[in-house]
Amino acid sequence: SSHTIKNYEDEKEKVFREILQKKGCEVVDISVGYNTFTTEKYQDAAARAFETCNDMDGILGVDMAAAACMREAQLRGRKVPEDLSIVAIDGTYITKIGPEILTAIVQPIEEMAQKLVSMIISQIEGKKIEEVESIFGVTVQSGETC
């Protein structure tokens, strides 16, 4: 059987944007596109972010984007977290390999993977998958960037 895959990222971004805008914040989206995993793409996006809005005071992005923005901030003389906060989303090892530990919203990736594998095995075995949507809790990794 086939299932329509809903992209919750778009929904989360929409709600995040709405909340910030209600608080009077300007939100600028700098995208690298879906399924982009090269450091060059993230470094290019970080450079574009600083060229587009050099006076920004906060950045939220996946781990690779946050790390690239941290590097770009240092190259441009921006002080983190004094005048620019950077928060990563995912909380993988990438947040811990630079000179500063990135503040991060940590997703339970192992738990998510186990759930997905279990669903795939059930589908292979011909079992009906009752629960196609799962909500996982997140934690905050205190770092040095926010």
Model regions and ranges:
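Hinge/beta->alpha junction and helix N-cap segments in small-molecule ligand-binding domains
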Residues: 1-21, 25-45, 58-67, 89-91, ...
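Flexible loop/turn connectors
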Residues: 47, 51-60, 64-146
